[in-house]
């Protein structure tokens, strides 16, 4: 997903290039994972600049192809520190390498799989604190919204309880924007049961919302229609840019990192996320509204003067109904203080 998104963004800036995707996902460009094909593809286009998009999972295919790499661009680079991915990232050769992440992973002791391994990742060129990004009009600060409920949630009633919680949260939203809500589900089973065994879809439709959901197990759906991922993300971009469109986007993990989802105003955390995933989920809803972005760049409004903004913050809602959900709230509060008040990064360690 991220490879395809990056491809779309790069192509708008450098359209006169040849493009190859080295992963198993869908794409309209050439796609292959066999290293022999990669070698031949590069040799067939000597007169063109070339962009090759891959995943950390498939990076070793590029290494096996023995093609010469001028620039290595690694997005969400903390993912490269996992045991399965580090072999590729530590062996790939290029003239220049750049690693981007808002949530770095470091190593401790004798573990080499951390972004503090300068032999692999080099030295830090730049690190911009979140308060500075808020001040210069790049992002918004998040606003925590606590939703208290007396319902007792168990593994047996979780789909029904989550449905009630979501409907109550949405019912109480007060905003001048058309709500576009990202819901992080506890797991795929609970999400699927809630969508298929409760009336949440029809209830949301009655309130004027469209429903989108995507998981690696069941695929992508728009309302009750299954679609391929390209249609899903094209629709998501279209609806995200439409100020009159209201929708609820359900997911489990798949949209947490890196994926650019335009227009999101709220996120609901139905599960206690790891630190990096929690920070990445917050990142989905603190993007500027397109009007504010354009007005800042046109000098119509002042960067960082949130009172002038059309969208003033990204709302992060946490349902509180048990000791574990209180823990989620506390972890979220500490994380936001760490990032948006202290100006530190939300880091973790590679194990």
Model-predicted regions and their roles:
Residues 164-175, 180, 187, 324-351:
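Long, largely alpha-helical accessory region at the distal end of helicase-like NTP-driven motors
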Residues 123-192, 197:
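Conserved interdomain linker/interface between the two RecA-like ATPase lobes of SF2 helicase motors
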Residues 17-61:
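Inter-Walker segment of RecA-like/P-loop motor cores
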Residues 188-215:
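Conserved helicase motor "Helicase C" RecA-like lobe of SF1/SF2 P-loop NTPases
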Residues 1-12, 21, 26, 186-192:
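Conserved Walker A/P-loop ATP-binding site and its immediately adjacent core
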Residues 80, 218-347:
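Conserved RecA-like P-loop NTPase helicase motor core
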Residues 39-40, 48-88, 251-253:
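Conserved RecA-like ASCE ATPase "motif II neighborhood" in helicase/translocase motors
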Residues 79-139:
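Post-DEXD/H (motif II) to motif III coupling segment of the RecA-like Helicase ATP-binding lobe
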